[in-house]
Every structure is written in structure tokens, then in C-alpha cells.
């Protein structure tokens, strides 16, 4: 189906104006108002980061969600993401879930439009209507998600499948609607309007990012999701996203997710009345044969749109094997330890991990004045205003959304074939010359990150030629001879973002190499100062350029006179009975794709949703301590701290914790090997890290052992040695040198912390374990050591050593 030219042209040049840009005071007020009802939850607010496939239940054994890693075929997510990426547009409708800003979000499939000013209700979304010919690209991913849902929650799937009206199914599944989110960190919310008797499904379709976990706010659990992951969950529990984890300001990232659900209002009487009205109307048109010949009314259940009741869990690191599918072989043993560890008055956590699960007077958190706004990286990185277009945050982020309009497949609908061919040739020529020069620069310096623009080069001339074509493309899109200043601003911003992306994606250059700033300066030369080069050119070059400019203008005018493209009736006024006209059969066998049912059976073969069996025998735990390198019972930390560090505000904040002071005043923990401990049917033995026993156990706990192994290769090998001693899993207990708020901090606060953190934790390790130069690692560094599968990360709350426990499967990596 061809796009609506008028609508597309309006969207191309629909950029924010100065009047639309709010003042900082207005933005702050809007943010404060939004987070009152929809607060953001950072990683620091949670206890568990869950990395693997698993079944997560509440305190009464009710399923919160089932997460499946790499559950979708690559081709299915690729096909769907290519189409659905354009469905996520700026919308104020969900701004309360984004700190008062308009996120990139959209809907597809069918929608009821109840409460919307749209006159015609209960029908296809505008996106599906306008992309009907391309819509089948989503069918494989919808089919695969539906079958995964059916295999892990058959009763919920059946209830939803029985209730959904057949006329609004997406490809025969129990889903009526898709919500597509791009670069959207959601604040805490429940999904209003979903069918109460079923579940929602979320899939990550595309992206490169860290963080942005799906957080279940009332349970302190984060589920990390990457492309191809799926989660089937109760969306009536409050959920949100944690912060994006950027190593530096302006780091590039993207994330595209899709939520699959049944919009319950589509099964209410008002919607059925609309379906029937349209059907009766269609019967009066002898030239129209509807795909669906009748409307079967179904029982829709009671949909109250209320949050699900919360039955909290009492977590511990031993809760993870009770959840993770790859650790179900040791789930019963883990439950024995978990129950004992979380019992009132239990000190098992201190015995195994060196400190309790929670400390009330740990290192104090920073105030909001030290933190970034939770939606601060929603748009592209901030840029200064310079040259040919506005580099403001809002203008550039809008251009990122619209750069697709300069792709050839879009332009082919709106400009003449002759002008399109000129555009493709000029664009290709410039990229070829840029690529040639970049290759030469890398040959001289392989570490080079910046592109050196030579004003007298062939590449520079090719850029001006491309700008000449681009200017006529702009006028062709506008359908007039002169562009308004705001239209020029919009186009050249989009043009620069398009070329920046082309250099990165097609030439594999760093984004900073052909930066927007560099392109902006050259556009300023073209638009405002480029003519100064013209008078210095040889007469033959001046003539060539004038003739070329005339040819480009003629090509553009030819496109304007060739007549408008045929377009479909406007979606707003579409009153036809066009339900299911977009449907078609997917021939999985012809494409050699696995049938969704067989694929789901394989993916879910290890899923466990029932109760755990009871363990009767002895559960054996080995706790490994660092060798005692020092016999000192107490170390004066002040002796080794430079004055500049000791007087810093960050050092004072860290040292202000009563829990930290207790650690500094306590005796070294590993001066001698503790005797074995028996707690019910749990037997705990201890060993120093250089003298591992050879007999097998159920679980191995490495208590700050890796901090005394500075070499990463040796540290990774040690984890493998420990894994060979257990039938269950390994618990890697270590300091995370990055504080729990690290990725939410402003740059200055992060720098202040980085300046003192390593020395601070080394002091605590020296006191606690006698490790004189502890290798304290970041979360990423710790996880890179794990040679098998890291199932989860447990964060000891308020820990003065910022201790985390990584739960590691002994099985090889998938």
C-alpha cells in the first residue's frame, strides 16, 4: 500500500519551533508533576537483576512472569522491527510515563479508540491501515510469541483466545494490538485496558543498549532483556524500566520493544455493535466482498483494569535457582538454604557471604541534585547551535526519527524518477569518496576517530553537488519553488542526520568521525558562504555547475508536473468493513522456517511452572575465603589515604556510614579457617582459596576471592575450578566498584566518585580480608570473567562493601 503523500510531506517538515520549546522551568514543573503519579525506579531500588530464562512467582506462588532468552528467530524479529520501527512516533498521550516528555511510542493492529476524539471506533489503527501491504511482515513474530505464550501459560492463553473477537485478531492469534516503544524508559505503571484473564507478552525486537531492565517495582526484581528475548507476564503488576547504562555522555544506543496483548474493550458490546454496523453497511455494496461474513459475539469476562494484588517475596541469592530454568536441577536444595537464610533471626547470610542480606545504616544515597533526570537521554545527545541548522536536542532527536524519509524507497513516492536517480548517484559518489579518504586516514593511524575534511578535495566538491541535489529534493517534497526558513531548517537537519547515519552504517565509521557539527559547518558553507568559492573556480567549472543546477531543477519540476500519486482514502473517514483484509497465510515450510508450535516446544522444554519437590537429604555448601595475606587485626585506613582524597566530599560521604565504621573497627574475617557449621539439613564447610577440597558439594560460595586474583584470566579460570566442585551453582561474592546509583549520576558526581572509590574499597578489603591491593572490579568486568552462564546478580542492600552476588551455572555457555 502506498503511503499518503500529503500526510508524509506534512510529517517530514513537522519539526519543533522555538515557540514549541518549553522553558527549563516548564520542563522541571512537568517532570515533577509526572513523577508524582508515575515515579521512575532505578536499579538501586531493586534487589535482583535476573539475566537468564526463568519463571518468576510472587509470595503465594502466582506467576508474575516467564522470561525466555533468545526465544525468537532472528529473521522474525528483523522483519518485524524493519516495519514497526516507524510506528513509534512522538506522542503526548504517554508523557506521564516519561517524566512529562513525549516518548517514541505507537500502536498497531486494532484499537477501540474509546475516549479518543476519533469519531469512528473499534477498527484498524492508522499504522496498520496505511501499511496494509507490508503488514504481513509482523506475522511470523506474532505467531512465535503466541505459541510461546500457549506453551508456558496454556490456561491464560485459552481464556484470551476464547474471548477475543475473531474480527480483530492479528493473524489468528489471541492478540488484537501491538504497542511499539523506541528509546522509551517507562516510569512505573500498569497496563490499563488489557484483558484481565490473560497475560501480556513483551519482546525486544532490536537495539544495542545496556540496562533498561523490565522492573517489577513491588517485588524488587529486574529482568534484563536483549533483542529476541520474550517475557510473558501479568502486566497488571506495576512495572517500569531501570536507567540506561551509558559509559559516557552521548554514547549511542537504541532499543525497540513490542508489547502483544488483547485490548479488552474490543470485546465489549459497543465494539460488537460497531462491527455489526459496518458489516450491514458493507452488504449494501455489491462491489465489496468482506473477508469476514459474520460477527460471532463471545463472552468477554469481567475486566476491571485494577492492579494485581501484591504478595511480596523474601529474596535471597538462593532464591535464584528456584526461578532459573537452567538451575532447576538444584532448585529444591536451594529452597532449603533460602528458607533457612530468610527465617527470622537467621545469620546464615553472614556465615556464607560475610555480611547480612540487608544493612540499614550502609552508605547513604545521593540526593536528586546529583542525579540526571530519568528521561534525560530520551533524545539524541545535546549539541550546540551552529551553522546551517539548529543542533538543539529536540531538533536533532526529531531528525533521527525522520531521516528515513531520505531513503530511496520513500523518495520514490514523492519525487521524479530522474531526480531520484540524481540523488542516488550524488549520494553514492560522495560516500565513495568519503570512504576512500577514511581508508587512507586509517592506514596512517588505525586509532583515528575524526575525519579530516579537506576543502580542496574531490570529496568536498561532491558534497556541494549532493547539496544541490538535496535542495531540489527539498523543494520537490514541498511542491513549491521557495522554502520557508523553518522548512529549510527542518530539511537540512534531517539531511545531516541522514548522512551521519550513512557514514556510520554503510562505511562503518564512528559516529563522531563525520559528526553533525562537521556537516553543519559545511552546510553553512553551501547555504550561506558556498558562493564565495564559485567566483574562484575556472570558467569551465562554473559553467558545469550552472548547467548541472539547471538539470537538477528541471528533474524536480518534471516530478511536480507528472501528477499526484494515487492514494487510499483517509484513515480518519474509513468506514468500511475491512477487518482481516490484511491477513494472509505464512508458508513456513516454503521459507524453511520452523513452525511456531515446534519452535515453542523446543524453546520451552526446560520451563518449570509447578511446585518444587521437597529435598530430604543433606545440602552441602562450600564457602571459600581468600588466603590470609596479613595478620593485622586492624588497619588504620588514614595511613594510606592522600590528603586530597580524605578531604573530598565523596570520601566523607562514604566514610559517614556507620556500617563502614564497623567494618573498619572489626577484626580481619579470615585470620583462621572457621569450623564447619550445621543448620538443620544444611552443612557448611570452609576452605582457603589456594587449598580447594576435591570432594563434591551442592553449592560453592566464593567470598571476595576474586579481589585477591588481579589477573582476569586467572580469575576466570578460578571460577571454572569452583564450578567443577559443585552439582548446583557457584555464588561469586564481590565488591562492585561502581555504586548502585552510578548510571543515574551527573557527570561531575560520577567523576568525584570514581576518584575515590577504588581506594575506599581497597581499604575495606585490607581490613576485612588482609588483601593489601584488592582488585575491585565493575559489574561489567566481573561478569566478563564468568566462563559459563550468569543467571542473576543479587545486591546485598546497604552493603558497606557494595557487595553483589553473581549466581553462576556450572553448565557451559549456550
Curated annotation (Swiss-Prot):
It catalyses: thymine + 2-oxoglutarate + O2 = 5-hydroxymethyluracil + succinate + CO2. GO terms for cellular component: nucleus. Binds 1 Fe(2+) ion per subunit. It is an enzyme of class 1 (oxidoreductase). Gene3D superfamilies: 3.60.130.30, JBP1, DNA-binding domain. Keywords: Dioxygenase, DNA-binding, Iron, Metal-binding, Nucleus, Oxidoreductase. Its EC number is 1.14.11.6. It is found in: Nucleus. GO terms for biological process: base J metabolic process; DNA repair. Residues 62-264 are annotated as: Thymine dioxygenase. 2-oxoglutarate binds at residue 255. Residues 392-561 are annotated as: DNA-binding JBP1 domain. GO terms for molecular function: DNA binding; DNA translocase activity; ferrous iron binding; thymine dioxygenase activity. Belongs to the TET family. JBP1 subfamily. Dioxygenase that catalyzes the first step of DNA base J (beta-d-glucosyl-HOMedU) biosynthesis by converting thymine to 5-hydroxymethyluracil (HOMedU). DNA base J is a hypermodified thymidine residue found in the genome of kinetoplastid parasites, which is localized primarily to repetitive DNA, namely the telomeres, and is implicated in the regulation of antigenic variation. Also specifically binds to base J-containing DNA (J-DNA). Monomer. Binds to DNA as a monomer. This is Thymine dioxygenase JBP1. The lineage of its organism: Eukaryota, Discoba, Euglenozoa, Kinetoplastea, Metakinetoplastina. The gene is JBP1.
